[in-house]
Amino acid sequence: SLKAGDVVHFKKGSAFSGNIRLRESGTAAKPIRLTSYGKGELPKFTNPSTRDASGNAITLGGEYIIVENLHFHDTPGERVSGMIIMTRLAALRIERGADHCIIRNNEFIKTGQGIMSAGEHTLITRNYLDGPSYALWRTSKSSWGPMGIHLNIGNQEVSYNTIKNFGTKDSPWGSDGGAIEIDCGRYHKKNIYIHHNYSEGNAGFIESSWDYDWPRFRQEIYNWRVSFNVCYDGQSWLFMLAP
């Protein structure tokens, strides 16, 4: 098992399929770190099945964990349906209570949902995300996704990321998806800082839900700062349903 201060090195050029879940925690002075070493392409991570940890390639269940210099790709989402999966589906997922984590300098390519975080005091920075063009699920009356970064709770910072092509026209609304989505009716939406991101080709930059939260608890937003972002997106720059 891992302990505070440990570093897990993945060799460049290697590939991993399935789920890796970290339950251990680091500390502020000695975080646990997942990173890469060697020469060549970044180590690749995927999980082709939603039956295995909801399609998460890496799941963080502990505090003070850093994930850096890894490549995530082709995690599922197409035609996936069901409310439970909506709160878990992502290439990299930070669970509720897994606070003070840092996700930096990673690549997410064709991941139905790149990063989902329910951890507070999280920093998501300097990642490159290039999404798929399909809906995560679709019916005749509704659709959902794809999304680059999905925040389930407040007290998080998203900065200096490049987020591209998370959007689909396979939707009864004409288009769906987006760069950053902030919803989950179970948790608060206070103190979110989104800055210096580059967003291109997505179905909108930021969406914050209200009646569409699941569970349907209405969480109002407080103390958001959105600044110095560059957006070349379709649909809308900001879709703010929650007051």
Where are these regions (language model features)?
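Residues at the loop-to-beta-strand transition
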Residues: 14, 20, 26, 49, ...
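Extracellular beta-strand/beta-solenoid scaffold signature
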Residues: 21, 47-58, 80-95, 109-116, ...
